[in-house]
Amino acid sequence: MFAVIFETRPQPSQFDTYLTIAKSLRPELANIDGFIENIRYKSLSRPGWILSLSFWRDEKSLVRWRTTATHHMAQEKGRDGVLEDYHLRVGQVTASVRSNEVKRVETVDAREQDDVTAVGAAKTVQLVRFQMDRGAGIDAAAGKLGLNPEEPRGLLAWDIMEAVLSPGDMILLASWETGSSSVSIPGADSDEVQVLRDYGKYDRREAPQFYPPAS
């Protein structure tokens, strides 16, 4: 299974346009063979940042979507002024926790090991889903997870986000230098993602399509 971790910061004046574009993509996205789900979250620590998190059966499924005209047009609009900034990571799910049972996914072959991002400092991203009361702050959420930023153990960056359409559905986005130190709470589902590509608006060295970096 593959994950696309797409963090965006729409221009404040273009936020409604961003939502309109996102909504227009859903019908075709849902019909792509191998598409699993897409959920949007808003950051609790970085005002204006949105996470679009999608899961795909395999890399071919993701390629099917990336080569559609609809996706290409949305990219053009985003780059042409809707998005002030973005950070996109694509990776393979290497371990999952469901109902407190760990499932190690043995699908990372030698080619994929060689393809681990050379640009991004974080080679692993951990995604932990959990529930909080609606409107809970980031300190309360971090406390529930037992997350201690003072003891990073390879933790490069983290954020906690709340689902846009279902307040109270939270996700921890933790970027680790190598493998992750497990962060878990009872009843929480999590995925570990090995990052294969890492790029953004201002650094596109690992992007699959050529666009000149924004200046």
Swiss-Prot record:
Residues in ABM domain copies: 2-90
One of the Pfam families matching this protein, by short name: ABM
InterPro entries: ABM_dom, Dimeric_a/b-barrel, Jasmonate_Hydroxylase-like
Single GO MF annotation: oxidoreductase activity
Annotated signal sequence range: none
Deletion consequences: Fails to develop blast disease on the rice host but does not affect vegetative growth, asexual development and appressorium formation. Significantly reduces the host penetration ability. Leads to the accumulation of a methylated form of jasmonate (MeJA) resulting in a strong induction of the host defense response in an otherwise susceptible rice plant. Does not affect the ability to cause blast disease in barley.
Catalyzed chemical reaction(s): jasmonate + NADPH + O2 + H(+) = (1R,2R)-12-hydroxyjasmonate + NADP(+) + H2O
GO-annotated cellular components: endoplasmic reticulum; extracellular region
Source superkingdom: Eukaryota
Record bears the keyword Chloroplast: no
Chain's role: Monooxygenase that converts the endogenous (and likely the host) jasmonate (JA) to its hydroxylated derivative 12-hydroxyjasmonate (12OH-JA), also known as tuberonic acid, a compound that attenuates or disables jasmonate-based host innate immunity and which is essential for proper initiation and elaboration of the blast disease in rice.
Stated name of the protein: Jasmonate monooxygenase ABM
